[in-house]
Amino acid sequence: MIVVADTTPLRYLVVIEREQLLPALYGRVLIPPAVAEELDHESTPDAVRAWLAGRPSWLEIRRPEHSLATQVDLDRGEREAIALAEEVAADLLLIDEWDARVEAERRHLRVVGTLESWPMAPASA
């Protein structure tokens, strides 16, 4: 399964110490550089920045080859996550922001938010 993630789901799961749900559910997760930069921003909680610094083996940073052309006002992380999901023909895009979800769905990407992925988690995760 190919999964691409935006910043918010990763940030929330790390803060509540449930980031291990991701490899349990999906194996490997791809993020674009803009998402990595947002996760490492000075305003990001220290726990998230430390998690990224010791990046787990299941998290891969991959740059999209093309930029996303859209009329919707999305931040760079959202645009790169959608572009990467399109390029790798992702099975799933983890993204929470409403406008980004609408744009991704318009592009026929399957989207799941942080809370939507929780019920799919195995009991041991």
Locations of regions flagged by a protein language model:
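Active-site-proximal, substrate-binding regions of enzyme catalytic domains
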Residues: 1-92, 98, 102-110
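Short alpha-helix plus adjacent loop in nuclease-associated cores
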Residues: 112-125
